[in-house]
């Protein structure tokens, strides 16, 4: 059985990775524009 804490940890990890991807994407876009 999967614990709720495990699910929370996975969701938090995915959220952090998504945030990092957004930041890197924004930086690359700014480089292309400038």
UniProtKB/Swiss-Prot annotation:
GO terms for cellular component: membrane; viral inner membrane; virion membrane. The chain crosses the membrane at residues 10-26. It is found in: Virion membrane. GO terms for biological process: symbiont entry into host cell via disruption of host cell envelope; symbiont entry into host cell via disruption of host cell wall peptidoglycan. Keywords: Capsid inner membrane protein, Degradation of host cell envelope components during virus entry, Degradation of host peptidoglycans during virus entry, Membrane, Transmembrane, Transmembrane helix, Virion, Virus entry into host cell. Coiled coil: none annotated. The keyword Kinase does not apply. Its main location: virion. It is a single-pass membrane protein. It comes from the Viruses. Exolysin that catalyzes the cleavage of the host peptidoglycans during virus entry. This is Peptidoglycan hydrolase P7. The lineage of its organism: Viruses, Varidnaviria, Bamfordvirae, Preplasmiviricota, Tectiliviricetes.
